[in-house]
Amino acid sequence: MSYIKKLRARLDSGEISAVELTKEYLAKIKEQDKRINSVITLCEAEALKEAEDADAIISAGKQGLLTGIPILHKDLFCTKGIRTTAASKMLDNFVAPYDSTVTKNCKDQGMVTLGKLNMDEFAMGSTNEYSYYGAVSNPWDLERVPGGSSGGSAAAVAAGFAPISTGSDTGGSVRQPASFCGLTAMKPSYGSTSRFGMVAFASSFDQAGIFGHYAEDVALMLDAIAGECEFDSTCVGVKQNHFTQDLEKDISGKVIGVDESLIKDLPAQIQEAVSKTLDNFKKLGAEIKSVKVPDLKEALSTYYIITPAEAAANLARYDGIRYGYRNPEARDLDELYRKSRTDGFGAEVKRRIMIGNYVLASSQYDSYYNKSQQLRKVMTDQINQIFTQVDAIFMPASPSEAFKKGDKLDPVSAYLSDIYTIPANISGLPAIAFPIGFANNLPVGGQLMAKAFNDNILTQMVVQYQKHYGIEEFILQQARI
C-alpha cells in the first residue's frame, strides 16, 4: 500500500501531469490551511518550476520513483533561496544560501517542494503551540493540538496537503504527532540520515524523519534521503535499500517485547487498541515476549537535562550580529546581545536555554549533566540487552490521544507526553509510530523500536501489519475533515 506508487502510476500514464498535481495540492493548501496553520511559507513559483522540470523528465522517459511527487518540509531544513525560520522570530527573514542534505536529496530525486511547515520554535515543544507563527490545529479536531515539535508536518499530511512530509525527531517529534494525527512516521537510527543543513536543537539526539499514511511510503522516502554525507561526521551511511529490503517478507517468527507495566495505567480505550494490535501481530506469526524496559521517568529526566544543555550551546550562535534578528535599539554590544536574544527567542526556547546553562555551570555540571550522561549510557546498554531476546519492542507512541490547546501549558505536563518516545532518542535507536485505533473518536498510535540500524525490521513489520489489517478507516475519516 503506497500513495507514492499510486501517484507514480498516474503521472507515468499521463492521467495527470506533475504541474496539474502540484496545482491541486497548492490550491488545497491555499483554501484550507487558514484553519490549520500548518504552512509557514508556500513555495508556489518554485514548486511549479520544479513540476515543469519533472514533466520534462517524465516525457523523456527518464523518471524515477519520486519524480514529480510533491512534498512539504519542516521549516528547519535549509532550502536554498527560500527562507528557513525554525518557527522563530530570530530567523524570520533568514534565507538559506544552501540546501540541507535532506532537501537536496529530495530535489535530486525530482520531488516538488510545495512549502515549509510550521513547528514548535527550534523544535522545542510537544504541542506546536510554541511557534512565532501561531499554533497549529489538529485536522481531526481543530480545538486540539497536532503534537510537536513536527506538528505542521503531521497536520499537513493528515489534511491532505501533501502525500508525504519531512520532520525531525529529537525526543519523539515525528512519532507523537503521528499518533495524534493518525499517520505513520519514523525516526531512523541516529546517523542514518544527515543533519547537515538542519537547524540544530540537540545534536546528539536530532534526526530527520518522515511522515506518510503508509509505512511503505515512509520506507521509500527514508531510502531516498538516507546515506553518507561528507558534511556530517555522525552520518555513517546505510546501503541503498536499507529501509525497503524486506518489505514483502512475512514476519512469522519475529519476537516483539512488551513491558506490561507501561500499558496497565493507560486509558481503557488505548489499552484496548494496544491489546488488539498485539493480537494482530500474533496472528501474523510474531511472538509476544514479556520484557522490562528502563524506568521511563528516569529517561525523561535525563533527556530534559542533556538536551537543554546541547540547545544552550547550539543557540549561542544567535547573537544579533552574524545572522538572525537584530534589535534596532541597542546602544552597545552587551545590550545588542541581550535585547536581540530576549526579543528573538520565545518563552519555551528561553526556558530551555536557561536550564541548559544552569546544568552546564561548573557548580552544577557533575551533579546534573555528567550524571545524566552516565545514566544515558546505562539506559542504552539496558535497552540493547533486551534486543538479545527480541527483534522489536512495542509500546504506545503517546499516553493519550490529542489534547485540547492550552491544556498542557505547564511545562512538566507537556514534557510527560514524550515519555514513551524518548528512550529511542536517548539510545539512538530506530522507532516507528503507526495508527492502532481510536480513543474518544481520535486516533492513537503504537510504536515499535529496534536495535540500531535494524530499521528494515520495523518497516517490514508495519508494512505487513498494514497490509493485513489496513489503515483505511484512518484515511477515510481524514478525507472527510
Curated annotation (Swiss-Prot):
The keyword Nucleotide-binding applies. It catalyses: L-glutamyl-tRNA(Gln) + L-glutamine + ATP + H2O = L-glutaminyl-tRNA(Gln) + L-glutamate + ADP + phosphate + H(+). Keywords: ATP-binding, Ligase, Nucleotide-binding, Protein biosynthesis. SUPFAM superfamilies: Amidase signature (AS) enzymes. The active site is at 74 (charge relay system), 149 (charge relay system), 173 (acyl-ester intermediate). GO terms for molecular function: ATP binding; glutaminyl-tRNA synthase (glutamine-hydrolyzing) activity. GO terms for biological process: translation. Its EC number is 6.3.5.7. Gene3D superfamilies: Amidase signature (AS) domain (3.90.1300.10). The keyword Isomerase does not apply. GO terms for cellular component: glutamyl-tRNA(Gln) amidotransferase complex. It comes from the Bacteria. Allows the formation of correctly charged Gln-tRNA(Gln) through the transamidation of misacylated Glu-tRNA(Gln) in organisms which lack glutaminyl-tRNA synthetase. The reaction takes place in the presence of glutamine and ATP through an activated gamma-phospho-Glu-tRNA(Gln). Heterotrimer of A, B and C subunits. NCBIfam families: gatA. Belongs to the amidase family. GatA subfamily. This is Glutamyl-tRNA(Gln) amidotransferase subunit A. The lineage of its organism: Bacteria, Pseudomonadati, Pseudomonadota, Gammaproteobacteria, Thiotrichales. The gene is gatA.
